[in-house]
Amino acid sequence: MNVYYEQDADLGYLQGKNIAVLGYGSQGHAHALNLKESGLNVRVGLRTDSASCQKARAAGLQVDTIADAVKWADVVMVLLPDQYQKAIYDSEIAPNMEPGNTLAFAHGFNIHYKQIVPPDTINVIMIAPKSPGHLVRRTFTEGNGVPCLIAIHHDATGEAKQQALAWAKGLGGAKAGVIETTIKNETETDLFGEQAVLCGGSAELIKAGFETLVEAGYPEELAYFECMHELKLIVDLFYEGGLSRMNYSVSDTAEYGGMTRGPRLITPAVKAEMKKILEEVQDGRFAKEFIDECNGGYKNLNRLRKENSSHPIETVGAKLRNMMSWLIKK
């Protein structure tokens, strides 16, 4: 894979252009502020009733309606929730874009699954920082940055890649490294990771471990500590130095037990199910299911949210976290 750094990116490809950042959430505030402080001309596009309008103005940013921001802009970054992007694109973005403009995303869902099909007359690019927005912002203010992915879906002007690199540089990402990929690969790996490992697999593993201990007669508090609370200690070791760092840092007892018992949990049958989940991402079945869920009023999602919030691990967890001064919000 191609990796680019500061010397490979030129902010000149965005200087003198009008840049609209649509949305001012976790990623939106980081993109808007970092680019502004990199010397670029940035406005934020929001709904008139958005609670974020006041926050963006307080940060020194000019705020317009989404339609007006797009009409003004040469480059538009869409940082709105996936499920709202198509409707807003159809009603407020597409009618106000001109040939030669650039449409940018931080995740490829709507482009890859053809919910949004831009005309061939505009650039379509992706710049995806591989960290939450608060870390994108914090590292920038510290003079550093986080790694970013870029992808070029369509180059109408001959400058799409240079603009994507310039955007990543404006975020601070070129100091860490900018990896070139495709919309397809970013979207499919991102969704699979969320479903099979990060949000789905890990949560179900935690609940199953907690339930196993409680059903065997152990106190819920001990089950919570062993299966939920201490997971952060292990994940931090993974994050800092990979599997080897974790194995080096834990006791020999933990290392041996993990290496000999872990494969009994993640069996070939589990991996086969992972492959099925990946296939549903690849062939669009998950995307269709999610879009139908959104259009149907989130009935299944709301039911699942209620079930998860009522799990015993949530009750005991809330009680134990109140004992942890470093977690108690002031």
From Swiss-Prot:
Recorded hits in Pfam families, A to Z, give: KARI_C, KARI_N
Cofactor(s) needed by this chain: Mg(2+)
Q: Which GO terms describe its molecular function?
A: ketol-acid reductoisomerase activity; magnesium ion binding; NADP binding
Q: Which reaction does it catalyse?
A: (2R)-2,3-dihydroxy-3-methylbutanoate + NADP(+) = (2S)-2-acetolactate + NADPH + H(+); (2R,3R)-2,3-dihydroxy-3-methylpentanoate + NADP(+) = (S)-2-ethyl-2-hydroxy-3-oxobutanoate + NADPH + H(+)
* Cross-referenced SUPFAM superfamilies: 6-phosphogluconate dehydrogenase C-terminal domain-like, NAD(P)-binding Rossmann-fold domains
Residues involved in NADP(+) binding: Y24, G25, S26, Q27, R47, S50, S52, D82, Q83, Y84, Q85, G133
**Pathway, according to UniProt?**
Amino-acid biosynthesis; L-isoleucine biosynthesis; L-isoleucine from 2-oxobutanoate: step 2/4; Amino-acid biosynthesis; L-valine biosynthesis; L-valine from pyruvate: step 2/4
Cofactor binding remark? Binds 2 magnesium ions per subunit.
What residues bind Mg(2+) 1, as annotated? D190, E194
Which parts of the sequence bind substrate?
S251
- Sites binding Mg(2+) 2 sit at D190, E226, E230
Q: Which GO cellular component term is one of those annotated?
A: cytosol
Q: Which residues form the KARI C-terminal knotted domain?
A: 182-327
Q: Which residues form the KARI N-terminal Rossmann domain?
A: 1-181
Gene3D superfamilies from the UniProt entry: 6.10.240.10, NAD(P)-binding Rossmann-like Domain (3.40.50.720)
* Statement: the UniProt record of this protein carries the keyword tRNA-binding: no
The alphabetical list of record keywords is: Amino-acid biosynthesis, Branched-chain amino acid biosynthesis, Magnesium, Metal-binding, NADP, Oxidoreductase
Q: What is its EC number?
A: 1.1.1.86
Q: Name its GO BP terms in alphabetical order.
A: isoleucine biosynthetic process; L-valine biosynthetic process
Residues of the active site are: H107
For this chain, the family text in UniProt reads: Belongs to the ketol-acid reductoisomerase family.
- Explain the purpose of this protein: Involved in the biosynthesis of branched-chain amino acids (BCAA). Catalyzes an alkyl-migration followed by a ketol-acid reduction of (S)-2-acetolactate (S2AL) to yield (R)-2,3-dihydroxy-isovalerate. In the isomerase reaction, S2AL is rearranged via a Mg-dependent methyl migration to produce 3-hydroxy-3-methyl-2-ketobutyrate (HMKB). In the reductase reaction, this 2-ketoacid undergoes a metal-dependent reduction by NADPH to yield (R)-2,3-dihydroxy-isovalerate.
Please report the name of this protein according to its UniProt entry.
Ketol-acid reductoisomerase (NADP(+))
Gene encoding this chain? ilvC
